[in-house]
Structure formats: structure tokens, C-alpha cells
């Protein structure tokens, strides 16, 4: 089929329907059976290094710095009290953080050095001792040999962290720890250092784990309660939002109870002070699993998808995992949006709804001021997200499905034609802001869908030019799928103005991860830069950092390791000090 081979493909709106239908054809042909991807998920090792990687091609010297990535690493624990412990859901893989030091040398050849470190050794030790996993997980299947009493008792044990989702640098307002600040002076190979005051790893729990930027050693944990005493709930978003101009950090805190409460807050980058922008406690505003949200120039916007928690959130304490705590998908359960003012202390200023759906990742949001037919100035808000028709994708990330153990891929995705819901659509909504605050929690207003770009012309794990966050923009980079594997199998640059797409595809078995766009210093064009992506070669069980031209998606170079590195979730590039 048109996109099944390796190369770079230029596609237009006219190709969308055919390319989307080819995903279905590839899935029905069970193409994943010839695409090995176990190396991306299983038997992954720690390499504290640093180890020099083999560079082929070029990486621009101006991209010097460090590319950090984090995600699940080890997925099994050998020799526990009950034998081998297997992690069942990818999101619960034991955290491992990776650092790729990109170092320009005097002779003009860039060097790339690699190191990694596990971030959940305490939890692994606990599993080794007990033979089962205690504490809150995303989707770990319950051990049938563990009794109710033992499960209940784990609710009262100290929390063991598995921070494996996203990386946050230069986080304001966090407490300083003199014992750990000293470690930040350690340098990498050839005296390499990055320009950051701190580095944290997050998850969808309110705690974030500080790590040493050079050694990757896990250090102290900070919770949102340390930022402000009212932020006492257990849930939040892995993806905090940052104002690209001020550096201010935004997120929300979700507390369960008789009436669940959302608190949207801002941490001032200059002062480190935390301000609660809005407190929303209403039975018509349900608690839900959310992984990301939206930021515009003047607003913080929360979209509550159909992934509602049962028992007003309290079922999480009974089930001990997120998946089993969520209500089944209901197409009548619309997405509910909360618009919060972030400039003038107005709190909740608007609400609206959109059709039932689910999403992991927001892409971007922005505002436009327009004049209506009467000459009155109005503000339109635009929201872009990688939207799924329902919640089927969540259980598609069980390791058995990802690695096709015992034909699990076909059993899951072919049942009830679930494969029709495996690929996201880049969706844009437009909402006209009321001229006066109308915090109506009946969600009677609605937004208009104004753009939809299907896979593989857009995909998951989306990233943009970092300085365009919350502002009008044109390009998004993402990891897409053609139906050739159980994960993603392509990288795509999507032009939101024209709906054109440039799609990079590697050889069979080469599974890419999240693309990270690094702008060229001083560049004016939004796509003038490079794209980094970690690619796992499942055929040879190796990995490499791929460097693509941000304009054309053509390969510039790659830095190869002679071992596999976990596909992981998210990363950031920090410039050299």
C-alpha cells in the first residue's frame, strides 16, 4: 500500500481517506505479526554510562545540549517471593529516565553520549519482597492470590512512586533541598552541563520526583500540597502547562469526596508563589482521568472527557488502579469544558460541551479577536487535540496486546470492531467566549468542530515549536500509525493551514517514539529546526536517536546504540550551559 515502505511521503488532503482506509486494511491483514517490537517493551536494561553512541550523518552543532526521555523500562521483576512478577499495563512499567548528551567538538563532529537510570528501585524492592505490587497503578491486573485484607492495608502504607511520564525543567516554587542541590553540580562527559535549575519527572499523581540532571539519580519528591495547602487532592495532569514568555507553570488538582473539587492554579516563575485561579466543586462537574489540558494567552481550559471515575472518584481507593475505577464509555456522556481566567482573577468564566470522546494529549490552544456582524469585538478560542472516538485505546496498551502474546492483539482489537477506534484524529474546536462571565455548570453552550485530520496524517504524542504554546501556530509533529504494528510506526509533520503532511517511515520493525522539535536559534520560520525521535530497531534489538530536518522530515543523522532502549513516553531538549 502507498505508505507501507520506508521513506518520506508528501501527502495532501486528497490522500486522507485512502491513507486512513489503508490503516484498516493493514490491521485486518494482521500486519503487526511481521513487525517485531518486543525490544521496545521487555527486558530493558539500565546503562548508567555515559556510553558514546555511533554517529552516522550529522547533527547540527547548534542542537548541543541534552535530550532527556522518560517512560516505562523494566516490566518484570525476577526472583520475587512469588516467582516472576509481570507488569500487565505499559503505563505501569517501572520508570526509567534517559539522557542523550549532544556535544559539538572542536573538529566539527558532534558527539552523542548516552546514560540511563531506573527511577523506581524502591518499588521494585517492595515487589521483590512481597511478590506483588501494592499501591496505586494505572491498570495493573489484580493478583488473585492476594486477599482483600492485604489490598486494603496497602492503602495505609507509604506511597511508592513510579514517576515515568513527562519531564519538567526549571519548575518554580518547589522547595529547595540543600542535600540534593549539591548533586546538580556534577557534569557529564567532556564537562558537558545543561542550562536548568532543576529537573523533575511527573505522572498523573500530584507528586513529582526531582532527579539530578547529570546523574539522573532520583531525589526528593514534591507534591502540589507543598506548593499550596489547598492542593491536597491525589490527582492531576502529567503535562503541566508553561507560559512560554513568563515561564509561569499551570496545572490543576483534583480532590475526591461527596462533591469532587477541581482547583486550577498558577505558580509564578518570578516569585515562586502559587495562586489558585479557580475552585470548582459541583456535582455536575465529574471527576475524570485527564492526562493534559489547554493554555491560551488569557485562559486555562480543562476538558473533562468521557473517562469519568465511578463513586465520585472514591472507587480508585477500592480498585487500586485507574482503569478499573473508570465508568464504561457512554456516548451520551459529553465532554465538559471549563474556561478559567488566568489574568484578572475572574475565576471560571465559561463552560461548554462537545460530543463524547477521549484524549490523552492536547496539542495547543490559542485565541483570536474578531469583529462580528455588528462590529462588536469578540474572542474565539481554538483547541487542538488528538481525539479518540471512545476509550478502547486505553486497554490497547496492555503488554499482552502490544507484544501480541497468545494472539492477544487480534482478540482485543477485532472484538466488536475495536480496531476502528485505535487511531486518533487531530481535531480542532472553536468556542466563542461570552462577553460577560457565564460559569453555567449545565454546560448548555457548545463548541464547533472546525478541523479534523485523520491518522496517519496526524498522530499521537504531539509536539510543537515550544515558543508557540498558547499562541496561533501552523505545524505539529507527532508519532502516527499505519496499522503495521501494535504501536506507532511513523513520524508526521502536519500543516494545519493546508492539511498537508510529511510522513517519515523507517524499515520494518523500526518503531519511533515521540518527536521532539528543537528550533534553530534565531530562526524566524516556525518549522526551521530539527526533530529528534528515539527509534527502536526491533529486528536487531537496538536503538538510535534519529535527527530529521524540521521542514522536510528528511534524515540528517542518527546516533546508534548497540542495545535496545525503551520506547518511552515523553522527552525534552535542554540547551547546554
Curated annotation (Swiss-Prot):
It comes from the Eukaryota. Induction: The expression is subject to photoinduction and is transcriptionally co-regulated with the genes of the other carotenoid biosynthetic enzymes. Its main location: cytoplasm. Fe(2+) binds at residues 239, 291, 361, 570. It is an enzyme of class 1 (oxidoreductase). InterPro entries: Carotenoid_Oase. The keyword Heme does not apply. Keywords: Carotenoid biosynthesis, Cytoplasm, Dioxygenase, Iron, Metal-binding, Oxidoreductase. Torulene dioxygenase; part of the pathway that mediates the biosynthesis of neurosporaxanthin, a carboxylic apocarotenoid acting as an essential protective pigments and leading to orange pigmentation. CarT mediates the cleavage of torulene into beta-apo-4'-carotenal, the aldehyde corresponding to the acidic neurosporaxanthin. Is also active on other monocyclic synthetic substrates such as beta-apo-8'-carotenal and beta-apo-10'-carotenal to produce beta-apo-14'-carotenal and retinal(beta-apo-15'-carotenal), respectively. This is Torulene dioxygenase. It comes from Fusarium fujikuroi (Bakanae and foot rot disease fungus). The gene is carT.
Amino acid at each position: 500500500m502507498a505508505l507501507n515502505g520506508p521513506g518520506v511521503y508528501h501527502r495532501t488532503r486528497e490522500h486522507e481517506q485512502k491513507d486512513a482506509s489503508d490503516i484498516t486494511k493493514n490491521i485486518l491483514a494482521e500486519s503487526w505479526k511481521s513487525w517485531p517490537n518486543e525490544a521496545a517493551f521487555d527486558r530493558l536494561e539500565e546503562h548508567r554510562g555515559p556510553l558514546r553512541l555511533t554517529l552516522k550523518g550529522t547533527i547540527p552543532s547548534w542542537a548541543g545540549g541534552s535530550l532527556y526521555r522518560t517512560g516505562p523500562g523494566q516490566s518484570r521483576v525476577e526472583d520475587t517471593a512469588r516467582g516472576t512478577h509481570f507488569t500487565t499495563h505499559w503505563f505501569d512499567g517501572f520508570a526509567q529516565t534517559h539522557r542523550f548528551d549532544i556535544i559539538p567538538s572542536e573538529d566539527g563532529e558532534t558527539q552523542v553520549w548516552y546514560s540511563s537510570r531506573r527511577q523506581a528501585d524502591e518499588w521494585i524492592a517492595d515487589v521483590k519482597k512481597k511478590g506483588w505490587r501494592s499501591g496505586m497503578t494505572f491498570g495493573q491486573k489484580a493478583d488473585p492470590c492476594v486477599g482483600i485484607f492485604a489490598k486494603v492495608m496497602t492503602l495505609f502504607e507509604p506511597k511508592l512512586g513510579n514517576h515515568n511520564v513527562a519531564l519538567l525543567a526549571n519548575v518554580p516554587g518547589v522547595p529547595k533541598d540543600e542535600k540534593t542541590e549539591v548533586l546538580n553540580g556534577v557534569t557529564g562527559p567532556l564537562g558537558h552541563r545543561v542550562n536548568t535549575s532543576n529537573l523533575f519527572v511527573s505522572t498523573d499523581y500530584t507528586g513529582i520526583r526531582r532527579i539530578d540532571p547529570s546523574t539522573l539519580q532520583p531525589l526528593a519528591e514534591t507534591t502540589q500540597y507543598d506548593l499550596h495547602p489547598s492542593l491536597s487532592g491525589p490527582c492531576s495532569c502529567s503535562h503541566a502547562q508553561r507560559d512560554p514568555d513568563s515561564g509561569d507553570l499551570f496545572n490543576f488538582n483534583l480532590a475526591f469526596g461527596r462533591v469532587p473539587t477541581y482547583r486550577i492554579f498558577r505558580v509564578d516563575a518570578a516569585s515562586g508563589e502559587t495562586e489558585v485561579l479557580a475552585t470548582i466543586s459541583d456535582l455536575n462537574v465529574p471527576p475524570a482521568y485527564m492526562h493534559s489540558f489547554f493554555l491560551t494567552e488569557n485562559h486555562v481550559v480543562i476538558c473533562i472527557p468521557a473517562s469519568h471515575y465511578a463513586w465520585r472518584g472514591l472507587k480508585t481507593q477500592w480498585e487500586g488502579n485507574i482503569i478499573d475505577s473508570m465508568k464504561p464509555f457512554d456516548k451520551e456522556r459529553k465532554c465538559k469544558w471549563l474556561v478559567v481566567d488566568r489574568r484578572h482573577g475572574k475565576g471560571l468564566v465559561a463552560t461548554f460541551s462537545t460530543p463524547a470522546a477521549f484524549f490523552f494529549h492536547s496539542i495547543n490552544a490559542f485565541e483570536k479577536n474578531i469583529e462580528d456582524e455588528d462590529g462588536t469585538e469578540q474572542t474565539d478560542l481554538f483547541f487542538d487535540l488528538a481525539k479518540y472516538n471512545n476509550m478502547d485505546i486505553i486497554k490497547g496498551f496492555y503488554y499482552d496486546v502490544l507484544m501480541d502474546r497468545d494472539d492477544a492483539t487480534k482478540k482485543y482489537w477485532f472484538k466488536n470492531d475495536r480496531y476502528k477506534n485505535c487511531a486518533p484524529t487531530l481535531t480542532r474546536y472553536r468556542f466563542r467566549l461570552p462577553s460577560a462571565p457565564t460559569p453555567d455548570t449545565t454546560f448548555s453552550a457548545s463548541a464547533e468542530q472546525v478541523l479534523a485530520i485523520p491518522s496517519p496524517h496526524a498522530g499521537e504524542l504531539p509536539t510543537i515549536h515550544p515558543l508557540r504554546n498558547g499562541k496561533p501556530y501552523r505545524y505539529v509533529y507527532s508519532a502516527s500509525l499505519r496499522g503495521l504494528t501494535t504501536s506507532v510506526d511513523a513520524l508526521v509533520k502536519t500543516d494545519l493551514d493546508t492539511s498537508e503532511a510529511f510522513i517519515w517511515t523507517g524499515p520494518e520493525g523500526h518503531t519511533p517514539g515521540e518527536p521532539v522539535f528543537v528550533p534553530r536559534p534565531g530562526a524566524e520560520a516556525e518549522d526551521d529546526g530539527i526533530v529528534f525521535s528515539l527509534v527502536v530497531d526491533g529486528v536487531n534489538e537496538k536503538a538510535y536517536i534519529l535527527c530529521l530536518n524540521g521542514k522536510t522530515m528528511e534524515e540528517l543523522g542518527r546516533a546508534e546504540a548497540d542495545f535496545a532502549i525503551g520506547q518511552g513516553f515523553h522527552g525534552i531538549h535542554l540547551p547546554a550551559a
